[in-house]
């Protein structure tokens, strides 16, 4: 379970459980502790500014980055009300390029279409997804590879299908791996070696 129902005027759901889940299984880790350089994008709902986390609590930054506006309550960070960064930059390729990435891989989570909503929350989620998906084509053009998991029949509230969703994401990633490796190899042999080492390390965790 990743959400709790709430009667807050700022959102229908709380995603505090996401933060608790991360801290339970990863501990109180910081973004800068990641073995792979990491940036997490959120948006300030009061100003419309993009907020990029490169340091600080991993749990807090993910909570902010997953707060779909109107559905989830914004996450308060340093006095700012933060929500899902997709409303300002759905495919944050520019952030990766600024960090020095030579090959950028995007993931399109809207390729499965939309399921008929069965609740007010699902109506809001569909509306959000439809609006955001209209921007992914333009922003996604900047990515070298776009991975498109088959998500037909699922919704953002399908926490009971987590294992199936993980498996589909893994399958889609493996299918794109040869293309990614080729691009990384062109970027430099050392880049390919680093990619393979990081991938093996991830598989062992």
Q: Would you name each region that the model predicts?
A:
Residues 1-205:
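Patatin-like phospholipase
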